């Protein structure tokens, strides 16, 4: 497989490639995709899009928005997509680390984004490989989800999301960026379990899936009400679990 390089997308053709990659990776209707005009306009407003290229072919991208949270100038990672034949080959990680480098060069210390808390693969990537942390749970963030591309029927599930905070200069993130092991964390004070195969559960028993989602929502809300921080994830064959800790300086 051809080696990939990362560079900024600047042309209309490259932005069209980002839209096509979303179709391929997510299988969502066009209404749910970030369109070319959005990518172009956000670039004029201080955002940017980094593409991963294998030769002349774009095989992944990450779209970054300039953001302000209170008095904090940060970044917001709106969408990332990787071509199916390049998934699980390190392209996503390469894009995220390139995003970190670019953001640091702009003087930004944090990047934020969201993911579905029921997705074990995303949780492992964001928490364990990138070193992001979470202290916020958003219920039904995008409205009811009727178009999960992994399913054969419309799911009608709330689009709950965890809000990631990527502290670009934390000891954990700095170590991971250098390819080293992250500093050992204290024992978690609470865990939140999720099904290991969420898509399969929704297909087999949508009612049970809805119950599991509601349980996870309430457990996270309880944890965050106690000021706990989610900063780790353990994957298992039957179930996986989020690890929550007492807050520590610099995480």
Put a short name on every predicted segment:
Residues 4-84, 231-236, 248:
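A conserved beta-strand-loop-helix scaffold within acyl/acetyltransferase catalytic domains
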């Amino acid at each position: 497989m051809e080696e990939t390089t990362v560079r900024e997308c600047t042309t209309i053709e490259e932005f069209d490639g980002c839209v096509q990659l979303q179709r391929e990776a997510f299988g969502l209707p066009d209404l749910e995709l970030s369109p070319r005009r959005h990518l172009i306009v956000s670039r004029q407003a201080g955002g940017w899009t980094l593409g991963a290229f294998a030769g002349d072919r774009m095989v992944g991208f990450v779209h970054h928005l300039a953001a302000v949270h209170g008095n904090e100038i940060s970044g917001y990672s709106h969408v990332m997509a990787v071509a199916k034949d390049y998934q699980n080959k390190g392209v996503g990680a390469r894009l995220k680390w390139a995003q970190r480098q670019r953001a640091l060069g702009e003087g930004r210390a944090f990047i934020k984004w969201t993911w579905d808390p029921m997705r074990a693969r995303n949780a492992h990537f964001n928490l364990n490989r990138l070193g992001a942390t979470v202290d916020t749970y958003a219920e039904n963030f995008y409205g009811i989800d009727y178009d999960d591309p992994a399913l054969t029927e419309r799911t009608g599930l709330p689009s709950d999301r965890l809000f990631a905070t990527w502290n670009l200069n934390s000891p954990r993130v700095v170590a991971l960026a250098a390819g080293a092991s992250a500093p050992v964390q204290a024992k978690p004070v609470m865990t939140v379990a999720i099904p290991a195969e969420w898509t399969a559960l929704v297909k087999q028993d949508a009612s049970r899936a809805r119950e599991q989602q509601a349980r996870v929502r309430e457990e996270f809300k309880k944890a965050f009400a106690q000021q706990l921080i989610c900063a780790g994830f353990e994957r298992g064959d039957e179930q996986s679990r989020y690890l929550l800790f007492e807050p520590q300086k610099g995480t």
